[in-house]
Design a protein with these regions (language model features):
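Conserved glycine-rich cofactor-binding loop
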Residues: 22-23
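Substrate-binding pocket helix/loop in short-chain dehydrogenase/reductase
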Residues: 105-106, 110-118, 203, 211-214
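The beta1-alpha1 cofactor-binding region of Rossmann-like NAD(H)/NADP(H)-dependent oxidoreductases
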Residues: 47, 68-80, 111, 227-228
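Short, small/polar-rich loop/turn modules that mediate ligand/substrate recognition or access, typified
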Residues: 184, 189, 244-246
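A conserved structural motif in NAD(P)-dependent oxidoreductases
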Residues: 218-229, 240
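Active-site helix of classical SDR
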Residues: 129, 165-168, 176
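Residue(s) in the substrate-gating loop at a strand-loop-helix junction
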Residues: 149
């Protein structure tokens, strides 16, 4: 018998790792998973933000742990997955959300800055997918959600210009498809979310430059609101999307239509 809708979206008993889960859209998506019943392992680079979010979530009755992590360091990644298994016994969902950016014209882009962006936004996602994927393969089940960007679907035609960021997010979309193809027959689904403009630590630096354009040109003429990403995250994490893999869902108010 088919599950009803409540059952399809229910994450009770599931455990999710959320990178960059202490602030912004990462925190929002983690909140959504917890509201659907999931246990959380949050990782972030700054203890003050991580501790604040953990305390807030525990105050709401969520089952949540946290660990400091630099996603570009393999040892840190392995430590997060190990801690998750030790605490909760499984890794059912991974949200690869941690990211950085650096703006510069291509001819002025410092190689060191380029590499930092690639290391976090692309290599870090691969490292976490690899480590979590090994555990998911033992279970023959799992959902990996990579947080890409509409920057990976388009370009910075009107500036400001972010060659490293755009390349990293386009690469992440390609990695999403390849991981989906590699692991689909082994019970693991891999999808991506490509947000448009939402208020966050990264986006707030440029939102003022784009907000008028968004209001004039978007099909839905505004910046994304708080809460408009977590539903998509829960959908992709849950059995509601059990026949979906290798896809990138743009949540952008119609910007890429």
């Amino acid at each position: 018998m088919a599950k009803n809708v409540r059952e399809l979206f229910n994450l009770s008993g599931k455990t999710a790792i959320v990178t960059g889960g202490s602030r912004g859209i990462g925190k929002e998506m983690a909140e959504g998973l917890a509201e659907a019943g999931a246990n959380l392992m949050l990782c972030a680079r700054r203890s003050e933000w991580l501790d604040e979010t953990i305390n807030e979530f525990r105050g709401r009755g969520f089952k949540v742990e946290g660990i400091l992590c630099d996603v570009a360091k393999p040892a840190d990644v392995e430590a997060v997955v190990k801690a998750t298994i030790e605490k909760f016994g499984a890794v059912d969902v991974l949200i690869n959300n941690a990211g950085i950016s650096w703006g510069a014209m291509p001819e002025d882009m410092e190689l060191e800055k380029w590499q930092q962006v690639i290391d976090v936004n692309l290599t870090g996602c691969f490292l976490f997918a690899q480590a979590a994927g090994r555990e998911m393969l033992k279970q023959n089940s799992g959902s990996i959600i990579n947080i890409a960007s509409i920057a990976g679907l388009t370009s910075s035609a009107n500036g400001p210009f972010y060659a490293g960021y755009v390349a990293s997010k386009a690469g992440l979309i390609g990695l999403t498809r390849e991981l989906a193809a590699s692991w689909g027959r082994k019970g693991i689904r891999v999808n991506a979310i490509a947000p448009g403009f939402f208020h966050s630590r990264l986006a707030d630096r440029v939102i003022d430059l784009y907000e008028r354009s968004v209001q004039e040109n978007n099909v839905i003429p505004r910046i994304g609101n708080e809460g408009e990403l977590k539903g998509v995250a829960v959908f992709l994490a849950s059995d509601a999307s059990s026949y979906i893999t290798g896809q990138t869902i743009a949540v952008d108010g119609g910007m890429t239509v």
